[in-house]
A protein has these predicted regions:
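Extracellular beta-propeller repeat domains
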Residues: 2-472
Length: 472
């Protein structure tokens, strides 16, 4: 498909006062490039987000496709987009339908994903595998158990340290309020926790989860004891703990904000996220929650003519800073922003009317660029775009998975890997094979400990983000 690209460069270094953009901090130049425009390319579509494959290309899901029920696409770094699978290719949409959530790259190099709808007569969604060659396999159909006790309408998911997949559903489960499930690569399924199991359903609501550095699962959801959402922990045995409660934004002095986004975690065990509303200025927050569950607000949104409503969460990039987007309901097309761990805020880009950043924070590729999507695009404002941000961030490598035992096989994604001379896990040398210029296969070496994975390439050393956790 023909690529449509437009470029906006914000060339400010020190003379920020001479530029009309409203910026909190002056720094190096940023470049936002609209890499792909669905409308200009003749597609009535918009994408949710993108991820990186072993071939260095970006993959995602979008509306449209051959049957107008969603598609999985591949996009080159230069913006050439190809549909590799259209949902509802099977009779009665047995393969699933929908344009969310995002697929992930599995430790075997295949894409894994969930389709929110379709699959069976209840239309409750599916879990699938897609090979690089485009071979589609349905691994599970939700609402296969009586009363949808296995969950209905899946959200996002992760691949755990044990190789199994873990995710949540919007509905179903024992209490018809969603469930956290485990699914093996071969399709073996079990529910670990059914939400709304506590009195008055204070544990209601579901969202995406992460696996913490301690191996337990963490997520955020609505409700809670104060009504504004909560942070929870679920162990692999299904035991549940409510760790922090957010206030309701309509309450006086709701400084923590309400309705938290999915989380990210740094190497020290701190959690970072956003709240959609509330906070000191009423327009949401970027927050940090420490390992002992102490809350710190890093930035409050909602000041007049500035960003507000950062409902999609944030990305922790390898420069140590947090990147996200805001919706700015009623003002403009949203903003792209950066917040340091110390709370220093920078507005990087203001989207024009009708753009609207989509439902995910930016994704960092191994070339150092951050990629994101918009719901709408320029001109007729009908369909979406995929954009990139160049912010002077160094290239990196990514490990898949991000944790594993000694001897376990790991994929290392990157760029310019041909001719690499060493791979180390926190300083311990590993045996490796360069499969292509964009990925390496390696086994976790004996003696390795949790820390950074480094690859010595002909152009310099590349380090991993996040750190690799060595498990027992």
């Amino acid at each position: 498909m023909k690529n449509s690209k437009s470029r906006f460069t914000l060339g400010f270094v020190l003379a920020c006062a001479a530029i009309t953009f409203s910026l909190a901090v002056c720094a190096h130049a940023q470049t936002v490039t609209f890499v792909y425009d669905f409308h200009a390319s003749g597609q009535q579509s918009s994408a949710l987000s993108v991820i990186q494959g072993t071939d260095g290309n970006l993959y995602g899901v979008a509306a449209g496709g051959a049957y107008n029920q969603g598609q999985i696409f591949q996009m080159t770094p230069t913006g050439e987009l190809t549909t590799i699978y259209s949902f509802c290719s099977q009779p009665n949409c047995a393969d699933g339908e929908g344009q969310e959530p995002m697929p992930i790259l599995g430790s075997d190099g295949n894409l894994y994903g969930v389709a929110t709808f379709g699959g069976n007569a209840t239309g409750s969604g599916t879990f699938y595998k897609l090979t690089p060659a485009g071979q589609f396999t349905k691994l599970y159909t939700f609402c296969s158990a009586p009363g949808c006790a296995d969950g209905q309408w899946p959200h996002g998911f992760i691949q755990g340290r044990d190789g199994n997949f873990y995710g949540t559903t919007e509905s179903g489960g024992a209490n018809n309020s969603g469930a956290l499930y485990q699914l093996s690569p071969s399709g073996g399924f079990k529910v670990l926790y059914s939400f709304c199991s506590l009195p008055k359903c204070i544990d209601g609501g579901t969202s995406n989860i992460i696996q913490g550095i301690d191996g337990k699962f963490y997520g955020t959801a609505g409700k809670g004891t104060l009504g504004g959402g909560y942070l929870y922990q679920i162990a692999r045995d299904g035991s549940f703990n409510m760790l922090y409660n957010f206030c309701l934004y309509t309450d006086v002095n709701c400084t923590s904000g309400s309705y938290p986004s999915p989380l990210v975690q740094d190497a020290k065990g701190n959690f970072f996220g956003t709240t959609a509303y509330g906070g000191v200025n009423g327009g949401g927050t970027v927050f940090e929650i420490t390992p002992n569950y102490q809350f710190h607000m890093l930035h409050g949104f909602g000041v007049h003519n500035q960003a507000s409503d950062p409902i999609f969460g944030i990305t922790l990039a390898n420069d140590g800073n947090l990147y996200g987007t805001s919706v700015d309901y009623g003002y403009d097309g949203g903003r792209l922003f950066e917040v340091t761990p110390k709370g220093v805020y920078t507005e990087l880009y203001s989207f024009q009317c009708c753009y609207d950043p989509f439902w995910k924070p930016p994704f960092q590729a191994t070339n150092g660029l951050l990629y994101g999507t918009t719901l709408y695009g320029p001109g007729t404002c009908c369909y979406g775009t995929i954009f990139s941000l160049e912010n002077g961030i160094s290239p990196l490598v990514e490990t898949v998975p991000v944790a594993g035992k000694v001897g376990q096989s790991v994929l290392i994604l990157g760029n310019g890997l041909t001719g690499s001379t060493s791979v180390t896990f926190n300083g311990v040398a590993a045996k490796f094979t360069v499969e292509s210029d964009t990925y390496i296969k390696v086994a976790v070496p004996k003696g390795a400990t949790t820390g950074i994975v480094s690859v010595a390439t002909p152009s310099g050393t590349l380090n991993s983000n996040p750190q690799f956790v060595v498990t027992k």
